[in-house]
């Protein structure tokens, strides 16, 4: 390879790893709370990591994140209170109706088993299955975000090993087009209507913007 080609490959690897980190952080923030994630959003460490990753993979969104998202991600409540806020927002329907973080609640309601089978197929194509010890379904937002975290990391790995990344790029495009880009706008609308906790409102806002921008970039990369 010449120097210019080397630089282009390094840039693609860096972008893929940064995308992977963003998906991981979104899944952490929108998953069931744990002490470690609460600490990371309380001391600001995870917001810094998110901003650094966005600066690498999506500079235009990094500015929006700094101005509109990050200020709402700073947690000042206890872990117990944060856990209660999550349950109110997404689980208990008490004292107000909760928003749903399941794709099958928002689309294909009449054929959720078919949706689950399709998602299982996506995951199994890459050797992945849901944790048998857990009780999450394949259509949870966190499962889908973690799948994108996996695909973007595998793209970077392929590039580092001088292998073709096309299979991982196509999988990202297909999964975004068929799933996250379709239903995240519906989640955002429901969260805006039902959820008062700005931490979750902000993260869903960021997630929708990020998947839209990522799909646009995938289409460009595959057509280049």
From Swiss-Prot:
InterPro entries: DMSO/NO3_reduct_chaperone (IPR020945), DMSO_Rdtase_II_chaperone (IPR017843), TorD-like_sf (IPR036411), TorD/DmsD_chaperones (IPR050289). GO terms for cellular component: cytoplasm. SUPFAM superfamilies: TorD-like. Its main location: cytoplasm. It holds the Pfam family Nitrate_red_del. It is found in: Cytoplasm. Keywords: Chaperone, Cytoplasm. May function as a system-specific molybdenum chaperone protein essential for the assembly of the perchlorate reductase PcrAB complex prior to its periplasmic translocation via the Tat pathway. PANTHER family: CHAPERONE PROTEIN YCDY (PTHR34227), DIMETHYL SULFOXIDE REDUCTASE CHAPERONE-RELATED (PTHR34227:SF1). Belongs to the type II DMSO reductase enzyme chaperone family. This is Perchlorate reductase assembly chaperone protein. It comes from Dechloromonas aromatica (strain RCB). The gene is pcrD.
């Amino acid at each position: 390879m010449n120097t210019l080609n080397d630089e282009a490959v390094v840039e693609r690897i860096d972008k893929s790893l940064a995308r992977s980190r963003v998906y991981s952080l979104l899944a952490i923030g929108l998953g069931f709370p744990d002490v470690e994630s609460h600490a990371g959003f309380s001391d600001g460490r995870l917001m810094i990591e998110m901003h650094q990753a966005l600066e690498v993979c999506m500079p235009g969104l990094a500015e929006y994140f700094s101005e509109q998202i990050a200020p709402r991600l700073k947690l000042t409540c206890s872990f117990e209170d944060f856990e209660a806020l999550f349950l109110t927002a997404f689980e208990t329907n008490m004292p107000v109706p909760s928003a749903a973080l399941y794709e099958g609640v928002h689309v294909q309601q009449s054929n959720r088993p078919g949706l689950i089978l399709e998602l299982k197929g996506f995951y199994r194509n890459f050797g992945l299955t849901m944790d048998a010890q857990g009780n999450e379904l394949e259509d949870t937002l966190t499962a889908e975000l973690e799948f994108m975290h996996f695909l973007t990391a595998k793209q970077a790995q392929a590039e580092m090993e001088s292998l073709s990344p096309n299979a991982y790029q196509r999988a990202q495009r297909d999964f975004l087009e068929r799933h996250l880009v379709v239903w995240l706008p519906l989640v955002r609308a429901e969260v805006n209507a039902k959820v008062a906790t700005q931490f979750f409102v902000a993260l869903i806002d960021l997630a929708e913007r990020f998947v839209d921008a990522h799909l646009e970039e995938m289409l460009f990369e595959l057509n280049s």
